């Protein structure tokens, strides 16, 4: 499949022009929204993206440690380790991180959605949320496969325990409901405890 050059992708990002006392200043739309303490987590959760999200969280904490940060999520999930880097930073920093699902929050995306500040986790009305157990695939010697299988079981148990804490669901319910892909509407995600509310409009 043909990949668009980075220069073409960059050209598709809208620019915002602001008037200041020193004249005009232009920002790409994401940088402008970062000034409003808005971060976008869009697409596959992977190491490079996680590093950018972590850097933005730390920057906004240094700017105003007492103001909320808004993390908008539209993601099919991805790497557990990359996702946990974002999650741990969300819990570590002083500002509350409010999470909002736009489109979809699946797998690690759903975990990060649930990991937002209590009372400040939201879905938009037509978004979808999906939880499941972590995926794993490994080839090699039998003893190495056994080691990796044990590791993924440990990760599964850890994620289930943390999801139980964030949702208020018993661990047995989480284990059952993450055994296979489990899709939820925005209202179902709120009822389950993955988010606190469904937002139709601001205010």
Curated annotation (Swiss-Prot):
Any one GO CC term of the record: endopeptidase Clp complex
GO biological process, one term: protein quality control for misfolded or incompletely synthesized proteins
Subcellular localization: Cytoplasm
Documented EC number(s): 3.4.21.92
Entry keyword set: Cytoplasm, Hydrolase, Protease, Serine protease
Any matching Pfam family: CLP_protease
Molecular function terms, GO-annotated: ATP-dependent peptidase activity; ATPase binding; serine-type endopeptidase activity
Keyword Cytoplasm among record annotations: yes
Domain of life: Bacteria
Chief localization: cytoplasm
InterPro entries associated with the record: ClpP, ClpP/crotonase-like_dom_sf, ClpP/TepA, ClpP_His_AS, ClpP_Ser_AS
Gene3D superfamilies: 2-enoyl-CoA Hydratase, Chain A, domain 1
Catalytic function, reaction form: Hydrolysis of proteins to small peptides in the presence of ATP and magnesium. alpha-casein is the usual test substrate. In the absence of ATP, only oligopeptides shorter than five residues are hydrolyzed (such as succinyl-Leu-Tyr-|-NHMec, and Leu-Tyr-Leu-|-Tyr-Trp, in which cleavage of the -Tyr-|-Leu- and -Tyr-|-Trp bonds also occurs)
Transmembrane segments: none
Active site, UniProt feature: 107 (nucleophile), 132
The keyword Repressor is assigned to this record: no
Self-association state and partner proteins as the record states: Fourteen ClpP subunits assemble into 2 heptameric rings which stack back to back to give a disk-like structure with a central cavity, resembling the structure of eukaryotic proteasomes.
Family: Belongs to the peptidase S14 family.
Known role: Cleaves peptides in various proteins in a process that requires ATP hydrolysis. Has a chymotrypsin-like activity. Plays a major role in the degradation of misfolded proteins.
PANTHER family with a match to the protein in the record: ATP-DEPENDENT CLP PROTEASE PROTEOLYTIC SUBUNIT
Name recorded for this polypeptide: ATP-dependent Clp protease proteolytic subunit
Species for this entry: Shewanella piezotolerans (strain WP3 / JCM 13877)
Lineage: Bacteria, Pseudomonadati, Pseudomonadota, Gammaproteobacteria, Alteromonadales
